[in-house]
Amino acid sequence: MDSLDHMLTDPLELGPCGDGHGTRIMEDCLLGGTRVSLPEDLLEDPEIFFDVVSLSTWQEVLSDSQREHLQQFLPQFPEDSAEQQNELILALFSGENFRFGNPLHIAQKLFRDGHFNPEVVKYRQLCFKSQYKRYLNSQQQYFHRLLKQILASRSDLLEMARRSGPALPFRQKRPSPSRTPEEREWRTQQRYLKVLREVKEECGDTALSSDEEDLSSWLPSSPARSPSPAVPLRVVPTLSTTDMKTADKVELGDSDLKIMLKKHHEKRKHQPDHPDLLTGDLTLNDIMTRVNAGRKGSLAALYDLAVLKKKVKEKEEKKKKKIKTIKSEAEDLAEPLSSTEGVAPLSQAPSPLAIPAIKEEPLEDLKPCLGINEISSSFFSLLLEILLLESQASLPMLEERVLDWQSSPASSLNSWFSAAPNWAELVLPALQYLAGESRAVPSSFSPFVEFKEKTQQWKLLGQSQDNEKELAALFQLWLETKDQAFCKQENEDSSDATTPVPRVRTDYVVRPSTGEEKRVFQEQERYRYSQPHKAFTFRMHGFESVVGPVKGVFDKETSLNKAREHSLLRSDRPAYVTILSLVRDAAARLPNGEGTRAEICELLKDSQFLAPDVTSTQVNTVVSGALDRLHYEKDPCVKYDIGRKLWIYLHRDRSEEEFERIHQAQAAAAKARKALQQKPKPPSKVKSSSKESSIKVLSSGPSEQSQMSLSDSSMPPTPVTPVTPTTPALPAIPISPPPVSAVNKSGPSTVSEPAKSSSGVLLVSSPTMPHLGTMLSPASSQTAPSSQAAARVVSHSGSAGLSQVRVVAQPSLPAVPQQSGGPAQTLPQMPAGPQIRVPATATQTKVVPQTVMATVPVKAQTTAATVQRPGPGQTGLTVTSLPATASPVSKPATSSPGTSAPSASTAAVIQNVTGQNIIKQVAITGQLGVKPQTGNSIPLTATNFRIQGKDVLRLPPSSITTDAKGQTVLRITPDMMATLAKSQVTTVKLTQDLFGTGGNTTGKGISATLHVTSNPVHAADSPAKASSASAPSSTPTGTTVVKVTPDLKPTEASSSAFRLMPALGVSVADQKGKSTVASSEAKPAATIRIVQGLGVMPPKAGQTITVATHAKQGASVASGSGTVHTSAVSLPSMNAAVSKTVAVASGAASTPISISTGAPTVRQVPVSTTVVSTSQAGKLPTRITVPLSVISQPMKGKSVVTAPIIKGNLGANLSGLGRNIILTTMPAGTKLIAGNKPVSFLTAQQLQQLQQQGQATQVRIQTVPASHLQQGTASGSSKAVSTVVVTTAPSPKQAPEQQ
């Protein structure tokens, strides 16, 4: 190219352009790596280009050296190369074709299109590189797949050769076609479009979105339409040219339609304003007309759909006139067309007179051959087959197809053809019957077709081939009832054959009511809902409207529950007033029993139960949903008329008597159904009507009875909230008159003036705990001196469940000398041992002496309950369960003042004091897993007591279930126990070293006492704290210290199985009143004693109950020593056959009481308690623990770690407030759970809400003067203290005697 450089770089002499007469426009071109500038006219104008690049230029302009240089780029020939190159040059410049065009012409097009522009050349090179890389990658993938296929094929061949001999032929597996990503993407797009189309059809939306107009959005054919074989071309006369285009049914596939769309898009791009391509003025009806006309493939496509019926009738008349002249010709044509091979061409040319007949009549008779089976099992099958072929069809189209079928000769071969003269008139009733819109359909009927209101077309649901027998049976049923239905339709002025006649005809039109009309209606509505169990007649606007009773209300005594909250209804309405009942009344008030949804909404707005700020949109939305629900009821009261677009009230012909008769039948059916669902209860169980166990007061007179609902005969009874001063719920066992017991006086009393009684409650339940195994070494027991705190003990026994023992300690009872001569079993003094101190958040407060009531379930061994009176340094409450010991005790016969029956008051007051006196509950929960082993030690593997402070474990709703007996079951899982461990709690571990020295394990029991002290304790104040391994290094001032000390009790050698129970529920309340003997340093303390020894005890000749009060010196670090009052109660087992009731009154001194019994029953005594300590935390209200019995799980082997199940009868409403509500301080926003499940949490605000709603009439908040609460203080305060008082006052009922 060096010889051509001067030609390419020197400017061309184009004239006097340099003088300003013209301007050159040059363009850069990249030719083989050389960048040149060429005039733009040379590149764009072909004439200029070929004038420059021509044969004359080659011969005259170029020199010999230049021509030789250019000839090097020409092909080299072996012979006569120079001559052949010259011939090639001549052919090149003359424009001859070189198989793929002339290179000069191709170069001119490339210059003109800008392919030699430097930027274009650069990107073309990059594109070529990318394509080459893609090619290499595809080759690698191809060879990789090929290699895998070869290896797999080789392994298959080797395996086949190994299994079979060489004589057997090999069967090659054809590999399944792999799904490429492009194919998967296409299939995904098709699936998406199919789902989108079905959703749009379901919603009735026909508008096209922007993505549906894309090329890839063409939808496939409907899946409900089976692919029919290609229809052969019909034979028509050659002279009939007008019908050729519509007579042949064109089958277009997806590919054809996509090509058509692509061409349309191309035309729109090039000619956007062309009138034939503008689709903005097209409507959906136009498209439907075109699609339906082309789909039918008949002559009706040329006519307007509006006059289709008229044309069909004209064809019918024409057939009747010409049927004789063309009958033979039609039969000749029908026979060959019925075969699949088609029709032979006509050999004779038709005469001019026969042309009209041949042109029209054979075509009419051939219509039924197009996809319709002329012989069907029923008319319903014929209709469904037409719908299956058409996918969707309008009513005129279906009538036309049925008319064509009826005019065919083969239609008369059907056995049911003669049942109706004109089947085309029965198309609409048959479709309505198949859609389930007729009243004559069976109850188990499922619709076969549905009507699309948006498109006004009928659509097939499912496949009819699978239901031929069912369709035939339905068709026979329909034939029997259609005559009556159509007679009714002719008499009525309605399109629906099942619509009843209105009772009263009126010409009233629904309009907004005036104030007077609304007032009159609301007065009638108020009277109507005052007796919801009866029918009612509204008399408005000059006509009457009868409405039936409210659904589900069968008597006048309606439920006292509050109505469910609704955004559109008032909250103070009756519970049975719902949107459904109001809409039912509004539909009944429609004039003539029919109207639109807007009219129903207008009538509904007159109701007094609607909220005042309800908008018309909200009413319309709610009425729409309510009408749908009423439409699908078992006995529907409304129905939608598709043709007239009206809602019809179906019960408009019923009277009040008929309504009430149907309502009574429904009530009887509901009662019978409820009776079948309820399982019969065992005869040993008695259930109270109010879901609360009835509580009776024991007296010294005639015997009274108590009853209680038991979940199982082997389970302890479910105690209810104790009602002071009555006894807890007991099994229905006759109770003998209470004998008199002697009271031993064992020490002086420090209480010199009776105090006002305000009993706290000790709620004791029995959770599941494993056995402890053998006993420890013996230890000497000591009897501690005690001062008298009078106790009244009442004991029962029964065979159906566990007995209950109530211990009430009151300092106001006088002392009685002991009358028994037998020895008394008292609570021994605990020996010194290792102690564990657990600080809790509590400070010193001034708490008055307390009255403690304990409820303990009793089984077959002795249980001791110790109540310690408060002293300066400690508030003691000890509940001890001891093994039974044989002791010869005589039965006392003397009476005492304590034998009188308590008062019949049924109010239980649990006071939680704010301000300076706050009762704080610390719940102790946990499990003890023990494996019995031989030796002198007790291996406590999982002995963890968790002391829970202010936090309360929230139970998930899934843990509250109802068993088969109708009782609420609260399941505590190990996960919930783990949740307790994550809280801010302190763990007290009872280890092996805690229980003293080893020894003989066959005759000793074990007890652990937790002492809760309210005063400050420092590290150097008590020697017991030094032995505590788990206590914190420092104890803050004002904390409560929990001390755990071991205590050994003697037991029987034969008692080998024992069960240790954790603390569950004890609460203590302050006692109101004044006391003269108390100091400002007197502090109450709570002590919990958990004793092993609750095992299966053998029968003994006699058992002993000992109530002893003795004085014990309490450790007072800050204020010096003081006296602690302790009451020890030992409870024996009773014989089930001999019921005994003991009422004991003790004076101010220690008085042991002994009771002898007969042969005891072998039972177990589960014991559980809860610590209640005092603190200054001013949060209100505190927690009230629900008394629920804890059922023991069956033991599996010798090592048991099971989760306890708490069962109790929880009321369906909040009338039994004390049984199913836990009062605790919760954060704002805590929801109140009502219903069958117990309310878990309740704040003071929610308690007030309950009162306002009428759900908790037995709850009140009182303000108690502080003078009633400062019972042990030297100087009383007149400051009022707010107190929460929760009372439950069920009326005591006489329990029936259990047989």
Swiss-Prot record:
The keyword Acetylation applies. GO terms for biological process: chromatin remodeling; DNA recombination; DNA repair; positive regulation of DNA repair; positive regulation of DNA-templated transcription; positive regulation of telomere maintenance in response to DNA damage; regulation of cell cycle; regulation of chromosome organization. Residues 39-156 form the DEUBAD domain. Residues 216-232, 677-688, 695-715, 723-733, 892-902, 1019-1043 have a biased composition (Low complexity). Its main location: nucleus. Disulfide bonds: none annotated. It holds the Pfam family NFRKB_winged. PANTHER family: NFRKB-RELATED, NUCLEAR FACTOR RELATED TO KAPPA-B-BINDING PROTEIN. Belongs to the NFRKB family. Component of the chromatin remodeling INO80 complex; specifically part of a complex module associated with the N-terminus of INO80. Interacts with UCHL5; NFRKB competes with ADRM1 for interaction with UCHL5. Binds to the DNA consensus sequence 5'-GGGGAATCTCC-3'. Putative regulatory component of the chromatin remodeling INO80 complex which is involved in transcriptional regulation, DNA replication and probably DNA repair. Modulates the deubiquitinase activity of UCHL5 in the INO80 complex. This is Nuclear factor related to kappa-B-binding protein.
